[in-house]
């Protein structure tokens, strides 16, 4: 299939990029779609950027369709994070006559890229685009984890997918290919106790923004476990990201978003990183677009510094620890990477579930989880996924 039929070239008048000789910039390194007869060759690419210029299903945030080229305006001017990068920018997916046509195009594009082993950065566009991203993995038959950096849960009702209810539509798909959904950064006054209880009943993982800000290292295992990391820019506080129709005075700081983005880039498992709901019409002198460009830069920098140290690949690169929990009559197996000092722990389940969820039975964790087990306590993360795998 010719992917170029789904794309339009980048609007250079908005990007306004010019090469500078005094230092190599990211824009000099990316193979970019700027002329109709010169679509980038993806055969050697390992990372692709795509924009989606559609905001018709973004609730109360019309204008976010134009975000991709505004982000590129700042992204291309940043320094090259790595000397040898096989990176392409395929331009922007052409909006269909109906939103569902845009969704179909995104599904096809994601399917083709993921099937080639290419990791994708998606610049939205509205949050509803997470639904067609999920559908692409469904076509590939991959059971996935989604990490949503969002101040809300996106579980509202409605027959048509939109930015406020895409999660509801994902969990209603049958057969279902969602193993876990992680929300990082919800704000209680936006979601309410009933919705928090519902997320708990669904056995999804949720973390308040204040809880994570107390120690941002806790976000790393959550991101490392995710196939898709989707950022709603409203999760970042208004002072750092004003370009959204429903901003909040509270939320993550811009540098914390960059930290999360780098964790996602470093994750061997993450194959899609998306940022949505940035509305340039509401921006302050490009402040939000510039901050998001930094987050994308950190994802790229992390991606090209991946350690490929997921356990089971080569025993010489990790250590295995078995911790006996005497008071509980059980043991937990931990793995530590010798390359990156990152940790994982095994969660047992029956053979049928292990075969279906084989990519999800080894849980990323922190050294603190190992320490807790050494003190004869079962880590909360282990309990959560034990209950999920053995439900």
What is each residue range found by the language model?
Residues 2-49, 56-275, 279-391:
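Conserved alpha-helical scaffold segments that buttress catalytic/binding sites
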């Amino acid at each position: 299939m010719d992917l170029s039929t789904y794309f339009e070239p980048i609007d250079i008048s908005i990007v306004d990029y010019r090469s500078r000789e005094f230092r190599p910039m990211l824009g000099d390194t990316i193979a970019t779609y700027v002329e109709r007869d010169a679509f980038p060759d993806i055969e050697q690419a390992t990372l692709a950027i795509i924009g989606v210029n559609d905001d018709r299903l973004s609730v109360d945030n019309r204008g976010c369709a134009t975000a991709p080229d505004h982000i590129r305006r700042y992204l291309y001017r940043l320094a090259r994070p790595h000397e040898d990068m096989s990176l392409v920018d395929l331009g922007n997916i052409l909006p269909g006559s109906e939103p569902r046509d845009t969704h179909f195009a995104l599904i096809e594009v994601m399917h083709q890229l993921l099937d080639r082993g290419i990791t994708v950065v998606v610049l939205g566009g509205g949050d509803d685009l997470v639904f067609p991203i999920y559908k692409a993995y469904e076509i590939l038959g991959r059971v996935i984890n989604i990490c949503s950096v969002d101040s809300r849960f996106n579980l509202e009702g409605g027959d048509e997918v939109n930015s406020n209810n895409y999660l509801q539509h994902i969990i209603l798909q049958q057969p279902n290919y969602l193993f876990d959904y992680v929300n990082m950064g919800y704000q209680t006054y936006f979601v309410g106790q009933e919705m928090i209880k519902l997320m708990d009943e669904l056995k999804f993982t949720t973390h308040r923004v204040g809880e994570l800000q107390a120690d941002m290292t806790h976000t790393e295992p959550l991101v490392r476990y995710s196939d898709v990391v989707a950022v709603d820019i409203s999760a970042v506080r208004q002072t750092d990201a004003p370009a959204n129709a429903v901003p909040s005075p509270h939320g993550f700081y811009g540098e914390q978003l960059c930290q999360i983005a780098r964790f996602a880039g470093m994750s061997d498992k993450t194959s899609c990183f998306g940022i949505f709901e940035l509305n340039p019409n509401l921006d302050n002198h490009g402040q939000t677009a510039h901050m998001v460009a930094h987050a994308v830069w950190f994802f790229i920098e992390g991606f090209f510094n991946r350690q490929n140290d997921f356990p089971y690949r080569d025993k010489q690169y990790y250590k295995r620890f078995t911790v006996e929990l005497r008071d509980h009559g059980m043991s937990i197996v931990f793995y530590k990477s010798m390359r990156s000092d990152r940790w994982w722990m095994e969660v047992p389940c029956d053979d049928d579930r292990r075969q279906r969820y084989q990519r999800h039975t080894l849980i990323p964790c922190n050294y603190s989880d190992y320490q807790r087990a050494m003190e004869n306590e079962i880590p909360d993360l282990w309990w959560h996924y034990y209950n999920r795998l053995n439900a």
